[in-house]
A protein has these predicted regions:
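Residue-level marker of positions within ordered structural domains that often coincide
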Residues: 13, 177, 202
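N-terminal active-site beta-alpha-beta segment that forms phosphate/nucleotide-binding
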Residues: 1-109
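Positively charged, low-complexity intrinsically disordered regions
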Residues: 6, 40, 183-186, 195
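Ser/Thr-centric signal marking residues that sit
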Residues: 56, 174, 201
């Protein structure tokens, strides 16, 4: 896991804040919002992206007018969930992430859909996080929600080391451009206009 995180970190440095990143983010989020599970969802847990992640900032603002949008907040070793009520109600928290300042949301059974960030994913739906275990502790509290892993194409690898207790994603959503190919990338070069949505194989 350590070596895979190191590899992804080097690729993310090349990719962060690039024109390609913006293009891929737009395509990935277009695929996300077109997914039936997202369309049907009333309460959605998103994430306020860091500069090396799929950019969700405008997406959050857009959908907060139509759905109840939750965002995670780092509190010690846990992620608390809070309702997003607008950019004016955000403050910079741990790791420089913008976080809502409102009340904690604990009605986990009401959450229909989760967009999950990660360092890497594989075709089985396994996810590699940043190593702090925040989502590993959060996701078991929300077993009924549809879980979509969100990532750039270079973050899809042949295999993510997984433990028996790890929770798999229901789907991995990425754009399928292979501009940043590397030895672990399982996808062939594809047309830029296409969107790749791969259901994990169990």
């Amino acid at each position: 896991k350590k070596e895979l995180r190191k590899l992804m970190a080097s690729l993310k440095i090349r990719h962060a804040s690039s024109t390609l990143q913006k293009l891929q983010s737009a395509k990935i989020l277009a695929a996300l919002e077109a997914h039936p599970a997202f369309r049907a969802a009333t309460t959605v847990l998103l994430y306020h992206s860091l500069k090396d992640e799929v950019d969700t900032h405008a997406f959050i603002r857009k959908w907060s007018n139509e759905k109840r949008i939750l965002l995670p907040v780092v509190v010690g070793d846990e992620l608390e969930l809070r309702l997003y009520t607008g950019p004016e109600d955000m403050a910079t928290g741990t790791y420089g992430i913008e976080e809502p300042v409102g009340e904690t949301f604990t009605d986990y059974a009401d959450i229909d859909f989760i967009a999950v960030p990660g360092v890497a994913f594989d075709r089985k739906g396994n996810r590699l996080g940043r190593g702090k275990g925040y989502y590993d502790r959060l996701l078991p509290r929300i077993p009924a929600a549809y879980k979509a892993g969100i990532c750039f194409p270079f973050q899809i690898v042949e295999e993510v080391p997984a433990e028996a207790f790890d929770i798999c994603m229901d789907i991995i959503i990425t754009s399928n451009e292979d501009e940043l190919s590397h030895p672990h990338h399982p996808l062939p070069p594809c047309d830029l206009s296409l969107i790749h949505i791969s259901e994990p194989t169990r």
